[in-house]
């Protein structure tokens, strides 16, 4: 058994060498034939060889047979093609199955030095798990299934986890403030069908109960720049909080690297009963334009008209605008740098409240160094402080997070990672009596998630799928 890794390496090396020799023979034969074939015939053969090689190397997106799977973000959103994938894959005769997820076991203290009265601490385990499947339909069709589950209601608690200055949703009739709400047990159950209608052109329909409408950037759990941070951004409800929507339908059109989408969906956030299915209303709308100018960039701009998103403020409708830029650069087979910049704003009850997020993750083999900066504007009502501030002023909130983690072991394509991070919050002057001038948060965690799929593994997986089909 101790020689098994060497044998596997030799087998993989031999396979790669054989494939290289085979490709070299193909190129030599093709060059020889080109000397005797007419120009058009030679060009046709070269195009066929290029298309075959491209097909062999690329696992396709769930929403296009012409795009790489690496481009798929959450819902129907895009990330850069350069984005590596952390998942397991299993191929059957006609289907490709994918498993993805993350589990944090941590201790979280939101006010280490007890500077204020709003911090909290607890042991908990934020988590989420995905199962995805897809299959080709005829010559130009593609059918896909997406599911996502979270055991947050059990491992975090129905009231969520402590997070200073976080707002959004309710529990036991009160607004959740300085806490991040738990995600629902059923976070996504959606299906999609894509039809290739012309070269580099797709039309698709995605429906979910729950699902994610075409609004905002990919949700934070599915952004490479945020995957190491267990916390939701303070700007979550300004940009990507609609990722769990009970009732959504999205129609999209893609031409090359440009995509236009529109959604109709339920504006109301999930209720405090995290194990059931909320009533679908289909009373809200959104539109999103996505552009990937190169394999390293993904850009989007979107707008949503949300009807009564918060149960605590049922008469408050929200106009949400977002814009984002995501950049990913591979530095090696297991090293990369990923950066995301997001601007989001909510316009409601006559005010426009902006939020800016900048996050980055530098992965160097087994060690990751990551950070997040946020600026968020929230009013007294959102922080549940109307009694203290009758005129409901806006407060400017800033927070900086730095963290580091290291992969301790990889067993059966699964990483065990240990990390720690700290957040420095900058309190507005009027809120210092409650929060302190600069409360410091700290957490330490163990993380379990699928290991990085390297390029050689993705090529072999796709070749196995082609052989099965």
Predicted regions and their residues:
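N-terminal periplasmic/intermembrane-space "pro-region" immediately following the signal or transit peptide
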Residues: 18-104, 120, 134-137, 146, ...
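Residues on the lipid-exposed face of transmembrane beta-strands in outer-membrane beta-barrel proteins
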Residues: 87-88, 101, 129-135, 189-195, ...
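Residues that define the transmembrane beta-barrel architecture of outer-membrane proteins
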Residues: 95, 120-129, 183-189, 243-249, ...
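Outer-membrane beta-barrel translocator/channel fold
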Residues: 154-161, 168-185, 303-312, 336-357, ...
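Surface-exposed coil loops of outer-membrane beta-barrel proteins
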Residues: 156-290
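Outer-membrane beta-barrel "beta-signal"
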Residues: 402, 436-469
